[in-house]
Amino acid sequence: MVKKEVKKEKEIGKVIHYFDKAMVAVIKLSGGLKIGDTVKFVYNESEFIQPVESMEVEHKKVKSGKSKDEVAIKVNKETHEHAVVYKIA
């Protein structure tokens, strides 16, 4: 019997603004997030997964964000305001 690896997801924030031309999502964090983490964006029936490759707070590059921070990350696909963001472990 082959064991299937179960990936854990933890809600870490919500998209509060999306810049469609730049493809940047601003996330209000409810948990920690750092460069290299894998995140999943979920909005209605659509979802996608991507690694966090860059992050900014107040237009300054940062390596991590904590609860209550508003961080901007570049996204690979279109998302929407109010999308829920999960960190995948």
Could you tell me what each predicted segment is?
Residues 2-29, 33-89:
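Beta-strand/loop-dominated core regions that host nucleotide or nucleotide-derived cofactor-binding catalytic loops
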